[in-house]
Regions:
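ATP/NTP phosphate-donor binding region
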Residues: 1-61, 75-76
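A residue-level signal for conserved active-site and pocket-lining positions in enzyme catalytic cores
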Residues: 9, 46, 67, 125, ...
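Glycine-rich beta-strand-to-loop/alpha-helix junction loops that act as flexible
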Residues: 10, 64-66, 89-91
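Short, glycine/acidic-enriched loop or turn micro-motifs at the edges of active sites
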Residues: 12, 70, 93
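Catalytic core of DAGKc-family lipid kinases
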Residues: 31, 40, 79-155
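A glycine-rich beta-strand to alpha-helix segment
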Residues: 59-64, 68-69
Length: 155
């Protein structure tokens, strides 16, 4: 039986993830026999959910959120032994990784493009006990990113 976990960050993109959650669930239900949906409530949730899904033998983990949700989900899959296919729908402020991979920034278009038979390998790096898949930064950049308020993100 094929199983997929969907991790949704309900506050990503000013709440946009909630608006597209059912569309993603419907699309993935045409590709997997069982779909489980989990909503994040705070930091670390996506990592824990993804790790648990991999350890339970899920075939795929998809997330819907911004760069932080993508990063957390990748960390969970890595901690779970890289046993799941990873997919994501960008609904964040920057969506850096999706831009680098050529994934449409419009969530509806990104959902329509999902094809579980068309996957690609991405590189994963590790720094200390954290994994990263798109970039790593040190010094001023992460400090500035950490200090941006939700209100400033919407400007």
């Amino acid at each position: 039986m094929s199983r997929c976990l969907i991790i949704i960050n309900p506050v990503s993109g000013g709440g946009a993830a909630r608006r597209y959650a059912l569309d993603l669930q419907w699309k993935l239900s045409t590709l997997f026999e069982t779909i489980e949906v989990k909503f994040t409530r705070g930091e670390g949730d996506a990592t824990r959910f993804a790790k648990n899904a991999c350890e339970r033998g899920f075939d795929a983990v998809f997330c819907m959120g911004g760069d932080g949700t993508v990063n957390e989900t990748v960390n969970g899959i890595a901690q779970g032994g890289f046993s799941c296919t990873f997919g994501f729908i960008p609904v964040g402020t920057v969506n850096d990784m999706s831009r680098a991979l050529g994934i449409p920034q419009n969530p509806t278009q990104a959902i329509r493009r999902i094809d579980i038979n068309e996957t690609r390998t991405i590189d994963i790096g590790r720094c200390n006990d954290r994994y990263f898949c798109n970039n790593i930064a040190a010094g001023v950049i992460p400090k500035v990113v950490d200090e941006v308020t939700p209100k400033e993100k919407s400007i």
